[in-house]
Swiss-Prot record:
Residues 47-65 have a biased composition (Polar residues). This is Endothelin receptor type B. One of its GO terms (molecular function) is endothelin receptor activity. It comes from Oryctolagus cuniculus. The keyword Membrane applies. Residues 27-100, 163-174, 243-270, 350-361 are extracellular.
Length: 441
């Protein structure tokens, strides 16, 4: 029995990733931690030299890494070869407090909507047997990953932002980014598997969708979670709790340690931004574009009069394909700003440019917009399903209105009741006719 192409693709992808660069979301989901530390992107350039020396600039904060060598004086530097520091910014960026309030409000909104939406989505798929098919199980896997991120990471990040400290210890410092990266990996790989599954469903017109979880879909989900966890391991290794001296007080900061012990982790830290952009952003968009193009060509190639009996079945598959495309589109829009800010930092930022301060302010604002947009992705998938899919919309209404019975069960119950009423009326009419016959005779 030949495995489906989607499983083969995921297995090949897992092998390449495990043997190659086992990297994961380094900065994207933990980025709310950057503004929590007092030295900000623009403000750090007007700090005193003693403060700069104590602050580990080459960290996982929202500072361009390229600015670290020029900004931090090295103790081992010879006196005869001084290194000129770039001119400081005239004024700091005044966005820190504003970001605190905005990020707290957005995080609370994501927390409430995400728990309600994702838990409702999981309950719908669990309670309704007719909803337990391959695509919906992949959607449930995606919702479970988002739910883990919402419950564990968002409250810790909000507290860290408001308290400007990390009181949770070194173990949680490694666990929180690990869960964050695994959650993003589950989202990316689930969207790739959904796109491949939709092409297979449309290409095999005669394959009737059944109720239940296909065996290969279950294997795909296990593979998705295993690969996501493997890719998150470097974050648990690289992150550490660092104590810095800032204005006479000691702050504990959870960050990717600037000095990694192994050569692989040094390479991991250096190539992180490009890896994040290519795998965690471009890959799902490229796979969706490729397989949806093939799916469109396949649909146009089929004759219009072919298999008329399957018209309703094909309409359902097209609706599911539209739903998956909507999920991928929402993912791309939510993560575009944050990835754009990372790439601009790598390509445009010059530490010796006298006009770099304006670019720093722009990148900082773009970072903050991207942080909040990326946070919305954890709660927006159930909303997108509600707006796009009629079946999910009816199930959401049924579940959120606290109706214990599922939508399909209620619909079948109403049909049974109407049939019973019709039979009862028909039986009464037959009795009436027989009684009339009796009386007339």
């Amino acid at each position: 029995m030949q495995p489906p192409p989607s499983l083969c693709g995921l297995a090949l992808l897992a092998l390449v990733l495990a043997c190659g660069m086992a990297e994961v979301w380094g900065e994207e989901r933990e980025m709310p931690s950057a503004p929590a530390t007092p030295p900000l992107l623009g403000a750090s350039e007007i700090l005193t030299p003693s403060t700069k020396t104590s602050w580990p600039r080459d960290s996982n904060a929202s500072l361009p890494r390229s600015s670290a060598p020029a900004e931090i004086p090295k103790e081992g530097r010879t006196a005869g070869a001084p290194r000129r520091t770039p001119p400081p910014c005239q004024r700091p960026t005044e966005i820190k407090d504003t970001f605190k309030y905005i990020n707290t409000v957005v995080s609370c909104l994501v927390f409430v909507l995400g728990i309600i939406g994702n838990s409702t989505l999981l309950r719908i798929i669990y309670k309704n047997k007719c909803m337990r098919n391959g695509p919906n199980i992949l959607i449930a896997s995606l919702a479970l990953g988002d739910l883990l991120h919402i419950i564990i990471d968002i409250p810790i990040n909000v507290y860290k932002l408001l308290a400007e400290d990390w009181p949770f210890g070194a173990e949680m410092c490694k666990l929180v980014p690990f869960i964050q990266k695994a959650s993003v990996g589950i989202t990316v790989l689930s969207l790739c598997a959904l796109s491949i599954d939709r092409y297979r469903a449309v290409a095999s017109w005669s394959r009737i969708k059944g109720i239940g979880v296909p065996k290969w879909t279950a294997v795909e989900i296990v593979l998705i979670w295993v690969v996501s966890v493997i890719l998150a391991v470097p974050e648990a290794i690289g992150f550490n709790l660092v104590t810095i001296d800032y204005k006479g007080s000691y702050l504990r900061i959870c960050l990717l340690n600037p000095t990694q012990k192994t050569a692989f982790m040094q390479f991991y830290k250096t190539a992180k931004d490009w890896w994040l952009f290519s795998f965690y952003f471009c890959l799902p968009l490229a796979i969706t574009a490729f397989f949806y193009t093939l799916m469109t060509c396949e649909m146009l190639r089929k004759k219009s009069g072919m298999q008329i009996a399957l018209n309703d079945h094909l309409k359902q598959r097209r609706e599911v394909a539209k739903t998956v495309f909507c999920l991928v589109l929402v993912f791309g829009l939510c993560w575009l700003a944050l990835h754009l800010s990372r790439i601009l930092k790598l390509t445009l930022y010059d530490q010796n440019d006298p006009n770099r301060c304006e670019l720093l302010s722009f990148l900082l604002v773009l970072d903050y917009i991207g942080i909040n947009m990326a946070s919305l992705n954890s709660c927006i998938n159930p909303i997108a399903l509600y707006l796009v899919s009629k079946r999910f919309k009816n199930c959401f209404k049924s579940c959120l209105c606290c109706w214990c019975q599922s939508f399909e069960e209620k619909q079948s119950l109403e049909e049974k009741q109407s049939c019973l009423k019709f039979k009862a009326n028909d039986h009464g009419y037959d009795n009436f006719r027989s009684s009339n016959k009796y009386s007339s005779s």
